[in-house]
């Protein structure tokens, strides 16, 4: 377990806050983005404990307005600062925070940590959670134990890895969880404790994100209509939802198996926990049949995380075999 045992010790790394909008920057009766980076920092007295703190506004949008270009811009700004040894905190709308954080982890290639946080309640609301989350995030970004961990999500006093974090509650102040792994640590009285780490994956550096990668779920009674419609739109890749532990109706599996000969088709399990099995079931359309095709199992990643990673892989020019290898790093 790694912890800051000497609580009088000053932060080991200077921190840069990059703001991208979201609820944490919203005020007023209708909760519109208002606070820029300077305004956000000025509203949180607890940040005075951190010397040489920088704050830069990258964007000021609600999550639903973000584009892939916006997300890539935020991630590059964070990565560039981390390459200079600066700890980074990104404040971000929570609705798609996990997506941008995952993309950032795919790009991140430095030792300094990048930490995402946000808020459930606007800055002007009673009991606003943004200030505490921001102080906790800066504490983690400034700490020695967080070095080399990649991209983290700090929310509600918990520390999660970007590859595992999901928004699992719309209104709880502990809105994020990691169903597959649980949190990696906690922040208590402003001091981070990290009790587990996840191996980092080799980074990618896509020049832009201009590919089409939809998420296509499966349901009982699926007759392949949605699959055929999705493929008719000429996607560059597919994130495929399977039932249980990698199961599909046989006729639907055949459609996706044919598609996987031409484009990357990456499969996830509908349950929030668990991975595509290897050889437990043997009926038609089971995981044995799926793994006998060129469909790529995604391991423990959520569909949103898979999409961001697959977008980065395809946009960086990886072929299907290289994409398969990239996702094998997360496959149980």
Each language-model region and where it sits:
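Accessory alpha-helical/coil subdomains and C-terminal extensions
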Residues: 2, 9-14, 18-25, 30, ...
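Internal gly/pro-rich beta-alpha loop/helix module
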Residues: 116-188
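Short Gly/Thr/Asp-enriched flexible loops that form oxyanion-binding sites at enzyme active sites
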Residues: 91-112, 248-257
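Short acidic, glycine-rich surface-loop motifs adjacent to enzyme active sites
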Residues: 85-97, 233-244
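ATP/NTP phosphate-donor binding region
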Residues: 1-80, 254, 273, 297
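ATP/nucleoside-binding phosphotransfer catalytic cores, i.e., glycine-rich phosphate-binding loops
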Residues: 250-332
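Short acidic, glycine/serine/threonine-rich loops at helix termini
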Residues: 28-31, 101, 126-129, 161-167, ...
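Short beta-strand segments
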Residues: 18-20, 90-92, 115-118, 150-156, ...
